[in-house]
Amino acid sequence: MRLLLRNYSLMEAVKRLLPRPRKKIYNLGACFELVDIPKISYNPSELSEPRFLEYSNLSDKLHLREAIDKILIPRVVGTTNHSIVREYIVQSLRDLDWDVEVNSFHDHAPIKGKLHFHNIIATLNPNAERYLVLSCHYDSKYMPGVEFLGATDSAVPCAMLLNLAQVLQEQLKPLKKSKLSLMLLFFDGEEAFEEWGPKDSIYGARHLAKKWHHEGKLDRIDMLVLLDLLGAPDPAFYSFFENTESWYMRIQSVETRLAKLQLLERYASSGVAQRDPTRYFQSQAMRSSFIEDDHIPFLRRNVPILHLIPVPFPSVWHTPDDNASVIDYATTDNLALIIRLFALEYLLAGTEAK
């Protein structure tokens, strides 16, 4: 992914219409201005308290760690390890009775030449009319002479999605026949091989968004939620897009309810974090810049996006230190729980008995 500042003159015009930022944060040379999220009357359905408590106690931490271990190897597109990880993801979901399609295509990449890419598309009901799409990328960055594992980028997000499918097997069964269902999407080729640009990055996302646009399938996506750079301690998330702000507030609400019930781990079991984590999902929105990532081809085609990526990025981003040692398992377990409950609330709240 890459940080981008928007066109200067356009942004100056937009800034004049925005509330005064409370503060600024800086990351990789780019400045993000934060504005408070306005309080709105939107109140989507919530899970009943008994259901929320019941689902909060569902977990399989051992499976999550095993999934991370399986994926946490160098997995550059075109390598044997890349195929191993792809087959692991595909088989894991097929074993859980998901319908899995591998969208294969080839493209030319700098340095590497012609490469074969494979997006993984898993659905509970391939004939559903609408989908909540949870997504991440599974390739790792090409770094000659360096063993780059990409723990946060994006072994942990991949493992979180597989763990969600594992933990929620029973709860997701109704979605095999419902009009609204769940899709797990693992993009290939997110990383650039030489220098990030329109033809050297997000290969899988660019291909799939274009394909689905021509096939008329993008209209079936309620919202695409993209997970990236997760697993390091003390992340801070923000709302990037106004049209999904109500759903950002819902995931923020899930975190708040879990914290009040003391169901979030407060200390890191990995020893990475030396203090209690602060709130993950911040009560501010970013309005003056955005991050290039797998969501961009879908955003340009008017698909609603919820981008779950921490700002600032983890300090180990695109370095050999993005390995197992950076993973804070308290944070990882907490985020996995929040995302599971958010998905259940989105998909099931309207049908649950109050």
Curated annotation (Swiss-Prot):
Transport is among the record's keywords: no
One annotated Gene Ontology cellular component of this protein: extracellular region
Class of the enzyme per the UniProt entry, highest EC level: transferase
Reported effect, residue 136 to A: Does not affect catalysis, inhibitor binding or protein folding
pH dependence: Optimum pH is between 7.5 and 8.
Keywords per UniProt: Acyltransferase, Disulfide bond, Metal-binding, Mitochondrion, Secreted, Transferase, Transit peptide, Zinc
Disulfide bonds: 136-158
Catalysed transformations (reactions): N-terminal L-glutaminyl-[peptide] = N-terminal 5-oxo-L-prolyl-[peptide] + NH4(+)
InterPro entries found in the cross-reference section: M28_QC (IPR037457), Peptidase_M28 (IPR007484), QC/QCL (IPR040234)
Enzyme Commission identifier(s): 2.3.2.5
Active site: 190, 228
Xref: Pfam families: Peptidase_M28
Binding residue positions for Zn(2+): 153, 191, 318
Function as written in the Swiss-Prot or TrEMBL entry: Acts as a glutaminyl-peptide cyclotransferase. Responsible for the biosynthesis of pyroglutamyl peptides. Might be more efficient in the conversion of tri and tetrapeptides in vitro. Might have a relative preference for substrates containing hydrophobic amino acids in vitro.
Stated name of the protein: Glutaminyl-peptide cyclotransferase
Protein's organism: Drosophila melanogaster (Fruit fly)
